[in-house]
Curated annotation (Swiss-Prot):
It comes from Thermosynechococcus vestitus (strain NIES-2133 / IAM M-273 / BP-1). Keywords: Chlorophyll biosynthesis, Iron, Metal-binding, NADP, Oxidoreductase, Photosynthesis. Catalyzes the formation of the isocyclic ring in chlorophyll biosynthesis. Mediates the cyclase reaction, which results in the formation of divinylprotochlorophyllide (Pchlide) characteristic of all chlorophylls from magnesium-protoporphyrin IX 13-monomethyl ester (MgPMME). Its cofactor is Fe cation. Signal peptide: none annotated. Its EC number is 1.14.13.81. It catalyses: Mg-protoporphyrin IX 13-monomethyl ester + 3 NADPH + 3 O2 + 2 H(+) = 3,8-divinyl protochlorophyllide a + 3 NADP(+) + 5 H2O. Pfam families: Rubrerythrin. This is Magnesium-protoporphyrin IX monomethyl ester [oxidative] cyclase 2. GO terms for molecular function: iron ion binding; magnesium-protoporphyrin IX monomethyl ester (oxidative) cyclase activity. GO terms for biological process: light-independent chlorophyll biosynthetic process; photosynthesis. Belongs to the AcsF family.
Length: 354
């Protein structure tokens, strides 16, 4: 289960997190619409995935071993801060998934038993992940008070189709983040400064499995992949997830540097792999090979750094907001230009929708 409160000897209990556009949100959705989903087109696939989830291949994986008994005081202050921020946001993201899946399972229990059990088991996985990350933070004198957060943070309503798109992408991009870091450290163990990374290979299997479940849910609803409206939304959410990833990775560049990774190269590999994976689910994906794609994302990073510099000043809030506005509009302009780039027709590679 999720660790709600820290060990009293482990240090500071964190009850709030720094809120900005990159902070993971807590979501709610249209449970009535979810209960009415016709899953017949993907019934066989979903039942097979449910059997996998019941098998619970990772039931014994998230157990801390003796490697966690070391000391991490040798990390420099910048790397330590960036790593704690990484753990904190990752923990909140996993806990957000737990809350959403748990509520979906509860609401659907009597009306859509198949989907209810799937969400129940996905909530189990997310709880494990959040709890494991929270224990990692305790090693650095921090811990999230997740119970407090669940009661006090604002929940954002997302229509069900948005939930399906975004959670699918979140799980798949999470898979690629974990496996790329794991494979890199497998080749360069000298950069593995904390034992959490040894768990990423099996961990990412949960992310991949969850993503496959959401792929089946999306494909069970043809209106989510067909028609111009659906294609515009798919492009929008791909861009939103990729832009958020780019800004977040570069904000934590010191963390990736400590792992022996170049933040920009890592970001681009994760985006390329996720876009390639999404092409098996979405009927259109972004053209990440277009020369403007990464160059405009990089400009967003540079502008974001200026926004952070403004926020760090002691000026009045109204003046900060005024100074930020042209930079925020500039980021919006770059993202709009990326969005308007001709997309890639992924569906032509499938043959037929199934």
């Amino acid at each position: 289960m999720v660790a709600i409160a820290p060990n009293p000897h482990s240090g500071q209990s964190v009850k709030t997190i720094r809120e900005n556009l990159l902070t993971p949100r807590f979501y709610t959705t249209d449970f009535e619409q979810a209960a009415k989903l016709d899953l017949s087109r993907q019934q066989e696939q979903l039942e097979a995935m449910l059997a996998e989830m019941r098998a619970d291949y990772n039931r014994h994986h998230f157990v801390r071993d003796d490697s966690f008994k070391g000391t991490w005081d040798l990390l420099d202050a910048q790397t330590r801060k960036a790593f704690i921020d990484y753990l904190e946001r990752s923990c909140v993201s996993e806990f957000s998934g737990f809350l959403l899946f748990k509520e979906l399972s509860r609401k659907l229990k009597d009306r859509n038993p198949l989907l209810a059990e799937i969400f129940h088991l996905m909530a189990r996985d997310e709880a494990r992940h959040a709890g494991f990350l929270n224990k990692a933070m305790m090693d650095f004198g921090h811990a999230m008070d997740l119970g407090y957060l669940s009661k006090t943070r604002t929940y954002t309503f997302f229509p069900l189709p948005w939930v399906l798109y975004t959670v699918y992408l979140s799980e798949k991009i999470g898979y690629w983040r974990y496996i790329i870091i794991y494979r890199h450290l497998e080749k360069h163990p000298e950069h593995s400064f904390y034992p959490l990374f040894n768990y990423f290979e099996r961990w990412c299997q949960d992310e991949n499995r969850h993503g496959d479940i959401f792929k089946a849910l999306i494909h069970s609803q043809p209106q989510l992949i067909q028609g111009w409206g659906a294609k515009l939304w798919m492009r929008f959410f791909l861009l939103t997830v990729f832009a958020t990833h780019t800004l977040t990775v570069h904000e934590r560049a010191k963390f990736y540097e400590a792992l022996g990774l170049d933040a920009t190269a890592f970001d681009r590999e994760v985006i390329a792999k996720t876009n390639e994976t999404a092409a098996r689910t979405f009927s259109v994906v972004l053209n990440v090979d277009h020369p403007e794609f990464y160059s405009r994302l990089q400009r967003c990073v540079e502008i974001s750094n200026k926004l952070q510099a403004i926020e760090a000043t002691h000026q009045p809030k109204w003046l900060k907001a005024l100074r930020k506005l042209p930079h925020q509009l500039a980021i919006a302009g770059h993202l709009l230009r990326i969005y308007l780039l001709p997309p890639v027709n992924a569906q032509q590679e499938w043959g037929t929708v199934h």
